């Protein structure tokens, strides 16, 4: 009886070890795939920061826009921010909102990352799983002053891993903040009011050149 139990324990231990050894490469591959878009984004941000205010806003915008398209699932973010208002909208209004939201998102990043003063970015190679999503932790570290944490919530789509939310200081959801603002505008004036607000914000962020 004792020998039988010992053999069972050995078999179970070997099985567990085999499972863990096979699961580890899969998890590592998932982490690498989820982190890759954020590395692309950070490289783009550093590029426009080094270009700086001396480079026209629209030129920096043109540099970053395709990178945002490759790293963010803007459609998913917009729909999550708009919520139940989205489905009833005619396709043409959805397209208008999507275009305005894309311009606003890119303009926000170009405006926020507008000058390079020795800042560096740290991207954690290890992600944090939350349901079917992966959180990529990043830090913006200035030469002087406090560091800032920006965590990117990644979700896998047919196009690969894409950002579906950004957590400022590790907890403040950009989608949640937008949701309150967007739905208030939709309630008051519908899709047109939201689109106009996004266009106005984009123009303000770009000093009228957006």
Where are these regions (language model features)?
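N-terminal export leaders
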Residues: 6-12
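Bacterial N-terminal signal peptides
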Residues: 13-22
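Early exported N-terminus immediately downstream of N-terminal targeting peptides
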Residues: 31-109
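Short beta-strand edge/turn micro-motifs at domain boundaries
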Residues: 147-177
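Extracytoplasmic
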Residues: 33, 43, 59, 63, ...
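Surface-exposed, charged secondary-structure patches
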Residues: 106-148, 198-210
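Low-complexity, intrinsically disordered terminal/linker segments enriched in charged
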Residues: 167-210
């Amino acid at each position: 009886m004792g020998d039988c139990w010992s053999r069972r324990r050995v078999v179970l231990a070997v099985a567990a070890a085999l499972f863990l050894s096979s699961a580890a490469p899969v998890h590592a591959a998932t982490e690498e795939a989820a982190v890759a878009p954020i590395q692309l984004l950070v490289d783009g941000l550093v590029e426009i920061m080094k270009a700086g205010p001396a480079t026209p806003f629209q030129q920096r915008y043109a540099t970053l826009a395709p990178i945002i398209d490759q790293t963010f699932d803007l459609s998913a973010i917009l729909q999550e921010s708009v919520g139940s208002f989205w489905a009833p909208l005619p396709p043409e209004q959805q397209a208008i909102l999507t275009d305005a939201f894309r311009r606003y998102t890119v303009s926000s990043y170009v405006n926020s990352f507008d000058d390079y003063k020795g800042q560096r970015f740290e991207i954690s190679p290890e992600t944090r799983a939350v349901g079917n999503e992966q959180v990529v932790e990043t830090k913006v570290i200035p030469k002087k002053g406090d560091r800032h944490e920006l965590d990117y919530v990644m979700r896998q789509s047919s196009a690969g891993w894409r950002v579906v939310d950004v957590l400022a200081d590790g907890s403040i959801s950009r989608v949640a903040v937008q949701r309150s603002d967007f739905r208030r505008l939709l309630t008051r004036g519908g899709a047109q009011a939201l689109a106009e607000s996004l266009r106005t914000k984009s123009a303000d962020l770009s000093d009228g050149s957006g």
